[in-house]
């Protein structure tokens, strides 16, 4: 479908725990915010059509819709599917077809809330790595203590174990992401570890530290502990996917716990309700910066195309954030800038 639009993104609307109602709701909100955005809804045509009807978009309306189209698929990648099985047997899945559309140049990015391992395997197979990159990684931004500043963290789940050289490459790519996308001059790169001392940690962590130290193009600042993830001591935090995923989900859980506990505390008595009403504007602003939904959307960095992974349990607000992240990366030409930077000084040895 040829359209006069500046941005085209393929959505795996069948992926995730919440189903098409959430992903399609987010899609409709996204196009209302950005008139030059075209979204291709990949998935079961009947289910998509029925879901769109809830938003007063009929099949007849869709035929002439300038911002939405359907790419029918016959399969769904389940959360329980093993990555290699999904890669071999789910070639007509909504996830695979969304990636194929990016590979074919019919879409500029793919967004999915589906099975992380399957998405990683399929994206790696379909889109291939940027030359010089051994392993792509999931990267996302997190809030820090300083207002309007955040920290990039990778890997968040794509690679359960990483050797020292892969961690080194993550540091290189994360540095490029922070510098090229956020405009940070000489981003501070740190390795997540069980302590700041040089003697702490496993051998592969120590070897990665040596490699990063030797690359003078990287502003490596040493080890950082989990308690300092939000301290603004680094612009990029590097770890393997197992540690990163556990750390991320723990942080999200704590943020929601604080939010719920605060609501309970401010409704415990009449006096508490009074103070709560007075402090409500300040707390609303605070929790807006802490809300995990706005940081939903981890990018598979290191690929030749843009792939954004939303959490499997994402609500409509969170999936919308993932779409917006994809839009931003398309506009800023992230893969091209990473490739250029790798070719001009940030060489992965």
From Swiss-Prot:
Catalytic activity: a fatty acyl-[ACP] + phosphate = an acyl phosphate + holo-[ACP]
Pfam families on file: FA_synthesis (PF02504)
GO BP terms, alphabetized: fatty acid biosynthetic process; phospholipid biosynthetic process
Pathway named in the protein's UniProt entry: Lipid metabolism; phospholipid metabolism
Enzyme class: transferase
Superkingdom of origin: Bacteria
Gene Ontology CC annotation, any one: cytoplasm
Disulphide-bridged cysteine pairs: none
Compartments it resides in: Cytoplasm
Enzyme Commission number(s) of this protein: 2.3.1.274
MF GO annotations: phosphate:acyl-[acyl carrier protein] acyltransferase activity
Keyword entries, A-Z: Cytoplasm, Lipid biosynthesis, Lipid metabolism, Phospholipid biosynthesis, Phospholipid metabolism, Transferase
InterPro entries the UniProt entry points to: FA_synthesis (IPR003664), Phospholipid_synth_PlsX-like (IPR012281)
PANTHER family cross-referenced by the UniProt entry: FATTY ACID/PHOSPHOLIPID SYNTHESIS PROTEIN PLSX (PTHR30100), PHOSPHATE ACYLTRANSFERASE (PTHR30100:SF1)
Subunit structure comment from the entry: Homodimer. Probably interacts with PlsY.
Homology family: Belongs to the PlsX family.
Described function: Catalyzes the reversible formation of acyl-phosphate (acyl-PO(4)) from acyl-[acyl-carrier-protein] (acyl-ACP). This enzyme utilizes acyl-ACP as fatty acyl donor, but not acyl-CoA.
Protein name, entry field: Phosphate acyltransferase
Species name: Colwellia psychrerythraea (strain 34H / ATCC BAA-681) (Vibrio psychroerythus)
């Amino acid at each position: 479908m040829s359209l006069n639009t500046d941005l085209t993104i393929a959505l795996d609307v069948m992926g995730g725990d919440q189903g098409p109602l959430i992903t399609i709701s987010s899609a409709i909100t996204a196009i209302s915010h950005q008139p030059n955005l075209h979204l291709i809804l990949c998935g079961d045509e009947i289910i998509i059509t029925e879901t769109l009807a809830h938003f007063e978009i009929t099949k007849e309306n869709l035929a002439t819709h300038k911002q939405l189209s359907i790419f029918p698929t016959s399969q769904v990648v389940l959360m329980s599917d093993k990555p290699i099985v999904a890669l071999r047997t789910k070639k007509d899945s909504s996830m695979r077809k969304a990636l194929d559309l990016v590979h074919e140049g019919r879409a500029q990015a793919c967004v999915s809330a589906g099975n992380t391992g399957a998405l990683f395997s399929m994206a790696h197979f379909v889109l291939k790595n940027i030359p010089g990159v051994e392993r792509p990684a999931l990267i996302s931004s997190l809030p820090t203590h300083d207002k309007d500043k955040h920290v990039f963290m990778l890997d968040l789940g794509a690679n359960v174990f990483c050797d020292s050289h892969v961690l080194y490459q993550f540091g290189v790519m994360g540095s490029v992401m922070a510098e090229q996308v956020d405009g940070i001059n000489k981003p501070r790169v740190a390795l997540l570890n069980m302590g700041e001392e040089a003697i702490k940690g496993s051998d592969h962590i120590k070897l990665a530290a040596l490699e990063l130290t030797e690359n003078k193009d990287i502003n490596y600042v040493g080890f950082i502990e989990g308690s300092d993830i939000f301290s603004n001591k680094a612009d990029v935090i590097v770890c393997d996917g197992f540690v990163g995923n556990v750390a991320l989900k723990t942080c999200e859980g704590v943020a929601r716990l604080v939010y719920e506990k605060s609501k309970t505390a401010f409704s415990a008595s009449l006096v508490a309700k009074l103070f709560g009403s007075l402090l409500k504007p300040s707390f609303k602003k605070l929790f807006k910066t802490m809300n995990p939904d706005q940081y939903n959307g981890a990018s598979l960095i290191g690929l030749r195309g843009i792939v954004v992974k939303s959490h499997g349990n994402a609500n409509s607000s969170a999936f919308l954030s993932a779409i917006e992240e994809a839009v931003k990366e398309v506009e800023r030409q992230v893969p091209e800038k990473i490739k250029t930077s790798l070719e001009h000084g940030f060489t992965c040895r």
